[in-house]
Curated annotation (Swiss-Prot):
Keywords assigned by UniProt, alphabetized: Acetylation, Cell cycle, Cell division, Centromere, Chromosome, Coiled coil, Cytoplasm, Cytoskeleton, Isopeptide bond, Kinetochore, Mitosis, Nucleus, Phosphoprotein, Ubl conjugation
Residues annotated with N6-acetyllysine modification: 61
Gene that encodes it: Mad1l1
Cell compartments where the protein resides: Nucleus; Chromosome, Centromere, Kinetochore; Nucleus envelope; Cytoplasm, Cytoskeleton, Microtubule organizing center, Centrosome
GO cellular component: centrosome; cytoplasm; kinetochore; MAD1 complex; mitotic spindle; mitotic spindle assembly checkpoint MAD1-MAD2 complex; mitotic spindle pole; nuclear pore nuclear basket
GO molecular function, one term: identical protein binding
The name this protein goes by in its record: Mitotic spindle assembly checkpoint protein MAD1
Upper lineage: Eukaryota, Metazoa, Chordata, Craniata, Vertebrata
């Protein structure tokens, strides 16, 4: 806009100059008409030439001014371009530094986030461990609550039974008071005492004892009445007996005659019995002789069979001697041949031992070679990784060198354009200073490129060294493989025995692992039974209160579980926010606060106290269970062991052998039914099983009958 304004001012001045010249020419022409034509024309021509010269000078000056202004504008544009380039370079440098700082900050932030993530994971583990401990404590508390509920239920049952008994005693007292009018005053006192009995248990117990005494007196009176009735019945029976005796006395002579006849028959029968006894003795003797003869016949048949077997064996030995040519005529020859075979077996065993020792040595050598091969493979992998990293570094350096060369060429082109646009004389001091700075920058770029080239050459040299090292390692690996193949071919002849031994070792290890698993299962079952308390659920009634502590504890556990889940979700959101690198939300900043050391110490103390409490409870449970088992063994006479899940082994204390046992299996819902499994001992008592289990369907009767039978066997022995 300034250039256009200056051009318009120059044109307006030229136009005004031409107008002035034309006016002067008209004025001079009007004034000098009378002069001569030649003089006026000469003057006009000179004046016109002067005016043209002045106009030409003005035009040249304006053109010079315009050229100078264009030059200044070009210089300003060049300066502006240089300033913009310098500014862009400085901004690029600042951006590069800012990016480097930002990368460092991001790396530091990533480290912090990783540390925060590790702390969050550790905190989550601690929370999970705390949750597990709380769950264990809750299980223990629930177990205690169950025990307390059982005790409360038993207490309530006792209270209800006492109340029922009190009501019965009240009814009996009312009946006695109605029947006995003379005890009405005592009835009033008893009513007052019964009303007070509901409030005070001690007075109620005293009144119950008094009522029990009165009931005992009543029972004694009833017993006396029953005794009198029995005596009356006996007297009536005696009267009937007296009547019958009288009738029998009337029949006494006839009875005496019959008695004589019976005596005679008795003597005859005794004689017949004696003769019959003699005949039976003779018959038994003959039967014994017959049995001995039969046994002798059987023994003779057995001897003949054995003789035939021995003859067949002798014939087979003779045939073996003829076929093999061993010359075994006598037992001494056979024993000598057996001794020779044993000696051969010993020599073969020694050879086998030497072969196995050599095989073990070769296995050790093979193991060492395999270790060396693994080490060589690991070194080869490391060298390959290093080579890849060096190749990547070389590629990056080449790319960086190409970029630097492009920047250098660009700077040179810019400087060349500046040099072509401006003449040598028009350089200013600022331009020379910029040129020197550009030359210094070019020298620095040259130095940096030379350093990069040196690093590239060094990396290429290291890459060549690494390749040579990798080639040597591959050659060593091939040599080691060849050595291992030769070693394998050298001890392939004893590989079958080694495989057989390995199979035996694997079988033994499998059996050991199986036994360990069974042991763990049994220990878990024992712990489960100890924790459960070993009570019969079919006979034990569990009462739940309206304000049940276990339900409240479960509700608290559910609330704690929900709270922990929310905390885990907040922690996950915090971890995701930290991984993204963005700002942490305000709702997650509270979740990132870690507990103090005091809280951690208190929690650890609580955990230790809870663990100690659980350990003490376990010890108490174990001692109580042992006492309970001993008491059951002494009272019932049976030792109860858990073999597997829902199977129980009963061993009687009067058993003749330790292996004599019964195995019951719990079936039905919650083990309400028991089923007897077949064992060798159960096969020996089929009558008891048929009577008590199949017909009567009573396991206690079967066990008691079995105990009596075993006890009678031991006492009879």
């Amino acid at each position: 806009m300034e250039d256009l304004g200056e051009n318009t001012t120059v044109l307006s001045s030229l136009r005004s100059l031409n107008n002035f010249i034309s006016q002067r020419m008209e004025g001079t022409s009007g004034l000098d008409v009378s002069t001569s034509a030649s003089g006026s024309l000469q003057k006009q021509y000179e004046y016109h030439m002067q005016l043209e010269e002045r106009a030409e000078q003005i035009r040249s000056k304006s053109y010079l001014i315009q050229v100078e202004r264009e030059k200044m504008q070009m210089e300003l544009s060049h300066k502006r371009a240089r300033v913009e380039l310098e500014r862009a370079a400085s901004t690029n440098a600042r951006n590069y530094e800012r990016e480097v700082d930002r990368n460092q900050e991001l790396l530091a932030r990533i480290r912090q986030l990783q540390e925060c993530e590790a702390t969050a994971e550790e905190k989550m583990r601690e929370q999970l461990e705390r949750h597990r401990l709380c769950k264990q404590n809750l299980d223990a508390v629930s177990q205690q609550l169950r025990e307390q509920e059982d005790s409360l239920a038993s207490a309530r049952e006792m209270i209800s039974s006492l109340k029922g008994r009190v009501s019965e005693l009240q009814l009996s007292a009312m009946d006695q008071k109605v029947q006995v009018k003379r005890l009405e005053s005592e009835k009033q006192e008893l009513k007052e005492q019964l009303e007070l009995q509901q409030r005070k248990w001690q007075e109620a117990n005293q009144k119950i004892q008094e009522l029990q005494a009165s009931q005992d007196e009543r029972a004694e009176h009833e017993q006396k009445i029953k005794d009198l009735e029995q005596k009356l019945c006996l007297q009536e029976q005696d009267a009937a007996v007296v009547k019958s005796m009288k009738s029998e006395l009337m029949r006494m002579p006839r009875m005496e005659r019959e008695l004589k006849r019976l005596h005679e028959e008795n003597t005859h029968l005794r004689e017949m019995k004696e003769t019959n006894g003699l005949l039976t003795e003779e018959l038994e003797g003959l039967q014994r002789k017959l049995s001995r003869q039969e046994k002798m016949q059987e023994a003779l048949v057995d001897l003949e069979l054995e003789k035939e077997k021995l003859l067949a064996k002798l014939q087979s030995w003779e045939n073996l001697d003829q076929t093999m040519g061993l010359n075994l005529r006598t037992p001494e020859d056979l024993s000598r041949f057996v001794v020779e075979l044993q000696q051969r077996e010993l020599t073969l065993k020694e050879k086998n031992n030497s072969i196995t020792s050599s095989a073990r040595g070769l296995e050790k050598v093979q193991q060492q070679l395999q270790d060396e091969v693994r080490q060589a493979n690991a070194q080869l992998l490391e060298e390959r990784k290093k080579r890849e990293t060096h190749e990547a570094l070389a590629r990056r350096l080449q790319k960086r060198n190409a970029l630097l060369t492009k920047e250098r060429d660009g700077m040179r082109a810019i400087l060349g354009s500046y040099d072509s646009e401006l003449t040598q004389t028009e350089y200013s001091t600022q331009l020379t200073q910029r040129l020197w700075e550009a030359e210094d920058m070019v020298q620095k770029v040259h130095a940096h490129s030379s350093e990069m080239e040196a690093q590239l050459s060094q990396a290429l040299e290291e890459l060549g060294v690494q390749k040579q090292r990798a080639d040597t390692l591959e050659m060593e690996l091939k040599m080691l493989k060849a050595q291992t193949s030769s070693a394998e071919s050298s001890f392939s002849f004893c590989k079958e025995e080694v495989d057989a031994l390995r199979l035996k070792v694997e079988e033994l290890e499998g059996e050991r692992s199986r036994l360990e698993q069974e042991k763990q299962v049994l220990e878990m079952q024992m712990e489960k039974l100890t924790l459960q308390g070993d009570y019969n659920q079919s006979r034990t009634k569990v009462l739940h209160m309206s304000l049940n502590p276990i339900s409240m504890a479960r509700q608290r556990q559910h609330e704690d579980h929900d709270r922990l889940q929310e905390e885990c979700e907040r922690l996950r959101g915090l971890v995701h926010a930290l991984e993204r690198g963005g700002p942490i939300p305000a709702d997650l900043e509270a979740a990132s606060s870690l507990p103090s050391s005091k809280e951690v110490a208190e929690l650890r103390k609580q955990v230790e106290s809870a663990e100690l409490k659980n350990q003490r409870l376990k010890e108490v449970f174990q001692t109580k269970i042992q006492e309970f088992r001993k008491v059951c063994y002494t009272l019932t006479g049976y030792q109860i062991d858990v073999t597997t899940e829902s199977q129980y082994r009963l061993t009687s204390r009067y058993a003749e052998h330790q292996t004599d046992c019964l195995i019951f299996k719990a079936t039905g819902p919650s083990g309400s039914k028991m089923q007897l499994l077949e064992t060798e001992f159960s096969r020996s008592v089929p009558e008891l099983i048929e009577l008590h289990l199949l017909q009567q369907d009573s396991i206690p009767a079967f066990l008691s009958a079995l105990t009596i039978e075993l006890f009678s066997r031991q006492t009879s022995i």
